[in-house]
Amino acid sequence: MTRDEALPDSHSAQNFYENYEPKEILGRGVSSVVRRCIHKPTCQEYAVKIIDITGGGSFSSEEVQELREATLKEVDILQKVSGHPNIIQLKDTYETNTFFFLVFDLMKRGELFDYLTEKVTLTEKETRKIMRALLEVVCTLHKLNIVHRDLKPENILLDDNMNIKLTDFGFSCQLQPGEKLREVCGTPSYLAPEIIQCSMDEGHPGYGKEVDMWSTGVIMYTLLAGSPPFWHRKQMLMLRMIMDGKYQFGSPEWDDYSDTVKDLVSRFLVVQPQDRCSAEEALAHPFFQEYVVEEVRHFSPRGKFKVICLTVLASVRIYYQYRRVKPVTREIVIRDPYALRPLRRLIDAYAFRIYGHWVKKGQQQNRAALFENTPKAVLLSLAEEEDF
């Protein structure tokens, strides 16, 4: 058993062990382990996040105090947003001299990232449901002046009905009126341009809640395309792409999506934060508008007859278009199989079945390797790297 797998001493954490029985590991963070646990009085399953604030004894006293304060701040924010249907619920907390135990709802469906790895890409309908719920969460947070700062598919959990729960508020912060942040934190491929600029320019005014909207745009693009909008194997070049806002709708997957969904993505991925779409504005976007039955006008008999005529004409036109379509021959399939939508999805699905184990298997492996993510990556000194 490794140090990470070892459980805290039962004597020092007596109150926790009296109420909960820890089980297998579900995930890991930089200084924490998430386990499934059983509530002894009710036999109910939960997830417990066990945070070692000493770093296994490697942290200095200042670092221990800093991590302790950060954990208390996370607990405070979770309590302030308690009750929201799409935010993970904090059920219980325990504290010792070296550990915190945070007990949450158990989301058995796992991370949105794993679901996306399995599905490759999502339909507009699936994306609409997930993004509407996520934007409603972000809207609630921003009304409380809370910025999450680490929005990504790994921090979005799913229940059995595909409802989402936002989790991991470790980087979250509640801003005072007019306050700006300068700390560089988050996951590289989801960082907003202004966060990167803060690390390079001491005179930069800082950033605010708008960084969450940029990350939301990256998530939406990734759900639809199956890969992030900004990616390069060299991290510095990827960060430059982010700062320049250089992305494209060039992959074949985008041919299957409407201009409406592309328009919403482009409103999120705006380099200047003041021009970026807010959560409230995004929810009013046509992509989320649906017909309400009561508001659909009733047709007159003449109108119904007109609809019938148009339907017949459309059916005839579709029939003749079908007759004119050239059959898919063996030569066409051999020449460009990826141009055919059914084959494209089949190829992608089998490619992920073959290579997916390289990404998400193994307890010590980074589950986000597919997108070059680094969980809890803090870019402390980008300016010390090669110049842009």
Swiss-Prot record:
Domain Protein kinase: start-end pairs: 20-288
Region listing for Calmodulin-binding (domain-N), in residue ranges: 303-327
Pfam families: Pkinase
Top-tier EC class: transferase
GO molecular function terms attached to this record: ATP binding; calmodulin binding; enzyme binding; phosphorylase kinase activity; protein serine kinase activity
Calmodulin-binding (domain-C) as annotated region, ranges: 343-367
SMART domains per record: S_TKc
Keyword annotations from UniProtKB, A to Z: ATP-binding, Calmodulin-binding, Carbohydrate metabolism, Glycogen metabolism, Kinase, Muscle protein, Nucleotide-binding, Serine/threonine-protein kinase, Transferase
Catalytically driven reaction(s): 2 ATP + phosphorylase b = 2 ADP + phosphorylase a; L-seryl-[tau protein] + ATP = O-phospho-L-seryl-[tau protein] + ADP + H(+); L-threonyl-[tau protein] + ATP = O-phospho-L-threonyl-[tau protein] + ADP + H(+); L-seryl-[protein] + ATP = O-phospho-L-seryl-[protein] + ADP + H(+)
Gene Ontology CC: cytoplasm; phosphorylase kinase complex
InterPro entries: Kinase-like_dom_sf, Phosph_kin_gamma, Prot_kinase_dom, Protein_kinase_ATP_BS, Ser/Thr_kinase_AS
Subunit structure: Hexadecamer of 4 heterotetramers, each composed of alpha, beta, gamma, and delta subunits. Alpha (PHKA1 or PHKA2) and beta (PHKB) are regulatory subunits, gamma (PHKG1 or PHKG2) is the catalytic subunit, and delta is calmodulin.
The protein's role, per its UniProt record: Catalytic subunit of the phosphorylase b kinase (PHK), which mediates the neural and hormonal regulation of glycogen breakdown (glycogenolysis) by phosphorylating and thereby activating glycogen phosphorylase. In vitro, phosphorylates PYGM, TNNI3, MAPT/TAU, GAP43 and NRGN/RC3.
Family: Belongs to the protein kinase superfamily. CAMK Ser/Thr protein kinase family.
Protein name (record): Phosphorylase b kinase gamma catalytic chain, skeletal muscle/heart isoform
Protein's organism: Rattus norvegicus (Rat)
Organism classification: Eukaryota, Metazoa, Chordata, Craniata, Vertebrata
